[in-house]
């Protein structure tokens, strides 16, 4: 089946990430609304130093009771039969594989091992393909190895049968290491993580998923898209990332200020917990960012339905492929507050 015919059901891609650890929170794949989702990135599989690819949690992936079947991955494979438009790809990497990716990608033998191992896992599980999440190619040499890796994968996962995607940050120091035009030739989509621009690690508060920067020294989703497209990546291959979580800062009422640390769990709140009780939600239309401020001075920055609509409009204006969301279980259950549903409707509205 060709890449174009696989995507014929939707004019734009509306993809979600689903981390396997959410099984332990009582979340299951069957809880999602597949009327507005056409791709799931199942996260994460890990990489060994010899190039092997393996599922990271056998119980969560293949044994836990999920929607009447065994394992969250098993549930997605079952749902794929019910929703014929649904693609499920295996996201390989993340933080646990940050140290092994540079080793594997630097060797032709290990790159081939990786590609063969990934294909075996894809075929055994009935997946549509894989997503490379190397955090991150930090030098020009690693950038060249990244290109060599995706080229090696395409030999074993040909584009007429399998999806191949990669996830990269909207950060010039990373993107400038990679020949993006050549890399994009091997990919179905390049997923741009247009969030985490600010957080508990930052010296000042800021909108963590802003579409437009508020000063020259800040990055933004629009800047990341510009970097990709000016480097030769076709707009239709770019997915803009939407966070289903907010970043918090204590002791400030907005962006651009020194703060007293972070509130919430690890400095963040799941989107379905926002806006916080007792706060008023506001939208910064210039940055395209939502926020709420608590009585304790806690400033939380995130996306809401209004900002997602604006980002979807941006995608259509720039000719981008669509949106993706990290991560699906954190979305609001109310369809009017759901960012996934809002994004789908906005992408497909005239």
Predicted regions and their residues:
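Substrate-binding surface in catalytic domains of secreted glycosidases
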Residues: 15, 19, 50-70, 135-276
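Short, acidic/polar
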Residues: 20-35, 106-124, 172-183, 221, ...
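Active-site groove signature of glycoside hydrolases
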Residues: 117-143, 192, 196, 324
């Amino acid at each position: 089946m060709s890449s174009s015919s696989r995507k014929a059901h939707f004019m734009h891609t509306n993809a979600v990430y689903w981390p396997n650890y959410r099984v332990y929170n009582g979340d299951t794949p069957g809880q999602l609304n597949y009327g507005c989702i056409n791709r799931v990135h199942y996260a994460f599989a890990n990489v060994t130093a010899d190039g092997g690819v393996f599922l990271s949690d056998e119980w969560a992936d293949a044994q836990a009771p999920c929607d009447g079947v065994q394992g969250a991955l098993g549930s997605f494979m079952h749902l794929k039969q019910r929703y014929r438009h649904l693609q499920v790809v295996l996201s390989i990497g993340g933080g646990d594989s940050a140290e092994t990716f540079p080793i594997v990608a630097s060797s032709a033998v290990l790159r081939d091992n990786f590609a063969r191992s990934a294909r075996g896992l894809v075929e055994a599980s009935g997946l549509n393909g894989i997503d490379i999440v190397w955090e991150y190619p930090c030098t020009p040499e690693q950038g060249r190895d990244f290109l060599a890796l995706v080229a090696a994968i395409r030999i074993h996962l040909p584009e007429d049968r399998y999806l191949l995607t990669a996830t990269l940050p909207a950060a010039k120091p990373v993107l400038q290491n990679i020949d993006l035009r050549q890399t994009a030739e091997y990919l179905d989509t390049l997923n741009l993580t247009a969030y985490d621009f600010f957080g508990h690690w930052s010296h000042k508060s800021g909108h963590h998923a802003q579409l437009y920067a508020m000063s020259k020294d800040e990055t933004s989703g629009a800047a990341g898209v510009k970097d990709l497209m000016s480097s030769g990546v076709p707009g239709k291959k770019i997915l803009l990332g939407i966070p289903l979580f907010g970043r918090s800062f204590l002791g400030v009422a907005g962006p651009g200020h020194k703060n007293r640390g972070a509130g919430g769990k690890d400095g963040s709140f799941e989107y379905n917990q926002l806006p916080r009780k007792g706060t008023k939600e506001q939208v910064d239309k210039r940055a395209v960012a939502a926020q709420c401020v608590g009585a304790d001075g806690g400033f939380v920055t995130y996306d809401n339905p209004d900002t997602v609509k604006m980002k979807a409009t941006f995608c259509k204006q720039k000719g981008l492929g669509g949106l993706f969301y990290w991560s699906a279980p954190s979305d609001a259950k109310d369809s009017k507050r759901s960012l996934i549903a809002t994004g789908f409707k906005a992408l497909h509205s005239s």
